[in-house]
Regions:
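Membrane-interface extramembranous regions at the lipid-water interface
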Residues: 27-83, 118-166
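Membrane-helix interface segments in multi-pass membrane proteins
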Residues: 1-31, 81-118, 166
Length: 166
């Protein structure tokens, strides 16, 4: 009887580990694709506004500041960039340490929600400047998909944002 349970556990544990790796690979793949769309759209929007940020839009946390600068709200962009850096540091800390402190996890969740709200506010300002009719609809779609469509929407409207729309 003990042999069957050992065989069962030997099959379940690798399955759970493989599922964990698959989910981790999909998350990393999504983050890379999202970052690429986000950087390209920020680069094109800043080029349309005659800003010289071609290479700076590819700096991971600085591009959030540039998005804030595009919407004439540097403070929100700076706060978002700092929040994203803190979220990254806490996530690495939680991943590296085997024992997760509940305090770090709660702080991480609060910071993720706060950065999501600030990201939605910045995106809504860009949507409102480009398509004032559809800005609310795009923001609702962005919120309902938990921000998954934000880089794609920004990528689609990147060439419509210029000095005239600002």
């Amino acid at each position: 009887m003990g042999g069957i349970s050992v065989l069962f556990l030997m099959g379940v544990v690798p399955f759970v580990y493989i599922m964990y790796l698959i989910v981790l690979v999909f998350i990393i793949l999504f983050l890379v694709i999202s970052y690429t769309f986000d950087s390209i759209s920020t680069m094109c929007i800043s080029k349309n506004l005659n800003y010289n940020y071609k290479l700076r839009t590819w700096i991971p946390f600085y591009n959030k500041y540039i998005l804030g600068k595009i919407t004439n709200n540097k403070t929100l962009g700076l706060i978002l960039g700092v929040l994203m850096f803190i979220i990254f540091c806490i996530s690495v800390h939680i991943y590296i340490n085997t024992e997760i402190g509940i305090v770090f996890f709660i702080i991480l969740l609060i910071l993720i929600v706060l950065s999501f709200v600030i990201d939605i506010i910045i995106s809504h300002k860009i949507y409102k400047n480009v398509t004032s009719k559809y800005a609310d609809i795009l923001t609702v779609v962005n919120v309902l998909t938990l921000g998954l469509t934000r880089p794609i929407i920004l990528f689609i409207i990147r060439n419509k944002y210029s000095k005239e729309t600002k």
